[in-house]
């Protein structure tokens, strides 16, 4: 079972957030302030939150990878490729497939944890 599947289930269970979202990702956003019920592009709240979670994971990967590079340690090209893929999958109207986004989250967590282990091994 995917880690993020549980996260999404918890999000869906929260009655007060059931139909709410906040997405300010694109130029289509209503009045330039962000979509709060459903995206002008058609994105629903669950997909918006799943994308937010993926971007949170990408930020974590980026922070650790940056620290490794600042200490002149190698970071695999796969890390950069993952970041580009994850960012591209969140662009407007490109991917509303929650399952594929969750798979990326799971993969990202593995990458982040591997990088963290590498950093800890070097006392970074």
Task: Label the predicted regions.
Residues 2-12:
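Short, positively charged and aromatic/hydrophobic N-terminal segments
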Residues 14-124:
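Metallocofactor- and cofactor-centric catalytic cores in central/energy metabolism, strongly enriched
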